[in-house]
Amino acid sequence: MFKINPIFKKTKYITINTSKDNNINKENIPNIPEGMWVKCDRCGKTLYKKDLDENLKVCKFCNKHYRMNAWERIDLIVDTGTFREFGENITSKNPLDFSGYEDKLKGIKEKTKLKEGVITGKGKIYGKNVVIAVMDSRFMMGSMGSAVGEKITRAVEKATEERLPIIIFTTSGGARMQESMFSLMQMAKTSAAIARHNEAGLLYIPVLTDPTTGGVIASFAMLGDIILSEPGTLIGFAGRRVIEQTIKQKLPDDFQSAEFLLEHGFLDKIVNRNELKKVLYKILELH
């Protein structure tokens, strides 16, 4: 077959004029503030940040529940003007003189305006008195150290003493490694307090939010009378890869999701954020 000499072939490219457009300058570029738009990491839709916040940080296209901080949750659940915080002066120390821990705590406190990774107090839900504890993932990923364990324990004990139900919103990466055994012993301490609350015939409702893992899920987070969760919450003890390497098996794609746990009987109900207050009130009323 006759072949064309390569020198006669057309080059496969086009010439682009790289000269600057004199009409383009900084005045022509729209000034869009940073953070005004958010791309949903589940469905890929672009969301107006203000609309996302007004929709309780839930994507209107795919129902992805983004994380809320502790005060946002309190404002969402507790009747306006009824919340009274207690235990606010309980803060973490550095019992093991862990290098850099004190500086890290100081920086996080300044950044988040929180004293610890959980806020505890009393309030009302549609007029029903309740003790509430809300963990905050912004504070060292909600890790449970001695101060977090102490605040939760005191909240449960106060609920027991005053014969009130307690609701705990969990979010945590697990035990706080900088406190080692002081952190791990909080698992037993919080669990014992909840056992005494249960023996008194009182109601405990944990609400699992993304993520709830490690020592928290292995202790008070799964000891509720009725266990609720938000959609899509990551729930588990060890990490996915650690488990797969240990058992030498491939895990399901939805493993450690709230939906997977509900299907296998570890949760009682998955509740959308905009329905959560009504569902909690209904449970309180039935009890």
UniProtKB/Swiss-Prot annotation:
It is found in: Cytoplasm. Zn(2+) binds at residues 40, 43, 59, 62. PROSITE patterns: COA_CT_NTER (PS50980). Disulfide bonds: none annotated. One of its GO terms (biological process) is malonyl-CoA biosynthetic process. Its cofactor is Zn(2+). Signal peptide: none annotated. The keyword ATP-binding applies. GO terms for molecular function: acetyl-CoA carboxylase activity; ATP binding; carboxyl- or carbamoyltransferase activity; zinc ion binding. A zinc finger (C4-type) spans 40-62. Keywords: ATP-binding, Cytoplasm, Fatty acid biosynthesis, Fatty acid metabolism, Lipid biosynthesis, Lipid metabolism, Metal-binding, Nucleotide-binding, Transferase, Zinc, Zinc-finger. It comes from the Bacteria. Coiled coil: none annotated. Pathway: Lipid metabolism; malonyl-CoA biosynthesis; malonyl-CoA from acetyl-CoA: step 1/1. Its EC number is 2.1.3.15. Binds 1 zinc ion per subunit. It catalyses: N(6)-carboxybiotinyl-L-lysyl-[protein] + acetyl-CoA = N(6)-biotinyl-L-lysyl-[protein] + malonyl-CoA. One of its GO terms (cellular component) is acetyl-CoA carboxylase complex. Residues 36-287 form the CoA carboxyltransferase N-terminal domain. Belongs to the AccD/PCCB family. Component of the acetyl coenzyme A carboxylase (ACC) complex. Biotin carboxylase (BC) catalyzes the carboxylation of biotin on its carrier protein (BCCP) and then the CO(2) group is transferred by the transcarboxylase to acetyl-CoA to form malonyl-CoA. This is Acetyl-coenzyme A carboxylase carboxyl transferase subunit beta. The lineage of its organism: Bacteria, Bacillati, Bacillota, Clostridia, Eubacteriales.
